[in-house]
A protein has these predicted regions:
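Short glycine- and Lys/Arg-enriched binding-loop motifs that mark or flank ligand-binding interfaces
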Residues: 22
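Short, glycine/acidic-rich hinge or "gate" loops at secondary-structure transitions
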Residues: 124-126
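Heme-based O2/NO sensor domains and their adjacent alpha-helical segments
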Residues: 5-19, 32-119, 128-129, 133-138
């Protein structure tokens, strides 16, 4: 399964409803479940302490923003791109010094969250985790 890896690709005209990873994953409900689990893991598991320290104490805004990005990125409603014109995850994280270790924490927590989301299509879930891991590793600067 091929998923978009850039904001430019993801911002292209959406496909017909039901034909994109967003809909195949289960839509907003599944995307929000992934994001909530991701941030819960970051809050609860000491393995993600360095990653957690890079975020504000209140993760509510991040939960909403990441869910919006993942929805748009995976072929759902384009609201995140319309609300953040010209931005992508890479440009938004440029001010942060992200090590390979922190990128690894991010991708591990995200893959766990995807795995815990109860996605029926295991191949799609694995592909999503893999592409997001590549994106996270692409932000590392060491």
């Amino acid at each position: 399964m091929n998923l978009a890896t850039s904001a430019e690709t993801a911002a292209a005209a959406p496909q017909a409803e039901g034909n994109t990873p967003f809909y195949k994953l289960g839509g907003h409900e599944t995307i929000q479940r992934i994001c909530n689990r991701f941030y819960d893991l970051m809050d609860e598991d000491p393995a993600y302490a360095e990653l957690r320290a890079m975020h504000a104490p209140d993760l509510a805004k991040m939960r909403h923003s990441l869910a919006g990005f993942l929805a748009a990125w995976s072929g759902g409603p384009r609201d995140w791109f319309q609300d953040n014109p010209g931005k992508c995850m890479m440009s938004m994280h440029k001010p942060f010094v992200i090590s390979k270790a922190v990128a690894g924490q991010w991708s591990d927590a995200m893959k766990r969250a995807i795995g815990d989301a109860g996605i029926e299509n295991a191949d799609l879930a694995k592909a999503m985790g893999g592409v997001l891991e590549e994106m996270a590793q692409g932000m590392a600067r060491d």
